[in-house]
Amino acid sequence: MPRSLKKGPFIDLHLLKKVEKAVESGDKKPLRTWSRRSTIFPNMIGLTIAVHNGRQHVPVFVSDEMVGHKLGEFAPTRTYRGHAADKKAKKR
């Protein structure tokens, strides 16, 4: 369910300050953040943001199609290794 238009998009203040500083200085170093809940804004386009997935920081290069989505959508938290093989079929 989307957020109310009356409230507007959410972004953590500390992340917004980091983004503005990086855009102002032209720095291309990845910005480390734990804020998976923050919305991607248009001024983030072209930046690499390292989003924490619970274990490590996953680098996410922000493109124009990502604007409006949350940072956490691009850093998966669960690893799927597949279902266990069928032991009966393996023996034959």
Curated annotation (Swiss-Prot):
An individual GO BP term: translation
Record-linked Pfam families: Ribosomal_S19 (PF00203)
Database matches in InterPro entries: Ribosomal_uS19, Ribosomal_uS19_bac-type, Ribosomal_uS19_CS, Ribosomal_uS19_SF
One GO MF term: rRNA binding
Gene3D superfamilies tied to this protein: 30s Ribosomal Protein S19, Chain A
Source organism, top-level taxon: Bacteria
Keywords attached to this entry: Ribonucleoprotein, Ribosomal protein, RNA-binding, rRNA-binding
Cellular component GO terms, alphabetical: cytoplasm; small ribosomal subunit
Similarity section: Belongs to the universal ribosomal protein uS19 family.
Purpose of the protein: Protein S19 forms a complex with S13 that binds strongly to the 16S ribosomal RNA.
Name of the featured protein: Small ribosomal subunit protein uS19
Species of provenance: Pectobacterium atrosepticum (strain SCRI 1043 / ATCC BAA-672)
